[in-house]
């Protein structure tokens, strides 16, 4: 699809049901009727960045900060594996407390003790760190590009440039990571043309995974009074992402459940072409009686989906949980042409 056709489809509210049906057909053909369950460990909400839309921003004095220890991270990852999930996602703010050596040790311990894939979502790190994490056994990296509008990116992420973000994403692929990207739908000042540019990027880059989420204003950020992203508009972005990437893993994030707790992720599966759900595996349980609750707080009152709730979403959508690690379908030589 060219940018003009993508923009027209994005703006065609009356024709969205046909778009949703096409996305579901593409998903069924290229991904099958199974879905990937991936357990997420939110291990730190410290962050050196000051993104205007994120509750983890360093200028937020009201957030309760936490850091999990290496043992806690590993134990949680092993519990995810024991629950039958084939992928562990280690996610944090951009937190330099966790050194290259610390993270490499955590990754090695996980892959030595469990047959799981390790996905990282740690923000931007030096290339030597990224290479070391790959060598330690991490095979995937999720780094959302957020928006392909460089001016909007700079406004939303003070002091940062889109060109640097894209360069890092390209480096991840060069290092051999299965590489995930994604955007935010509904950012203040974002246009339909901006969203079309995101979809063109998905089409050109053909990522191994896409993570799309809505803008939800956080009460402790400068954007607290802005409007929440629109569900139908976001689902049209989902559907177009599925159509242009065909067999990319497309995730229905927890923020989708925050926007619509009852049906958000279900709709992402049956209308948007999603085939991945990533339940939250915090709080970490030290024992059956000692529960440590860790709140990631990217958005106010973020809806966290448990493993059982994620399985219920799949049941409603008529999908079975896929066995194994759920590696990129692009690895089978099925790149979109």
Identify what each model region corresponds to.
Residues 23, 51, 90, 143, ...:
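Conserved, mostly hydrophobic/aromatic
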Residues 98-122, 160-180, 225-249, 302-318:
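Alpha-helix-loop-beta-strand connector modules within alpha/beta enzyme cores
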Residues 58-76, 80-101, 107-169, 178-185, ...:
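Core AdoMet radical
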Residues 31-72:
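Canonical Radical SAM [4Fe-4S] cluster-binding loop centered on the CxxxCxxC motif
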Residues 41-43, 94-96, 122-126, 147-149, ...:
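Active-site-proximal loop/turn and secondary-structure-junction residues that shape catalytic pockets
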Residues 2-36:
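An N-cap/entry alpha-helix motif that binds or orients negatively charged groups
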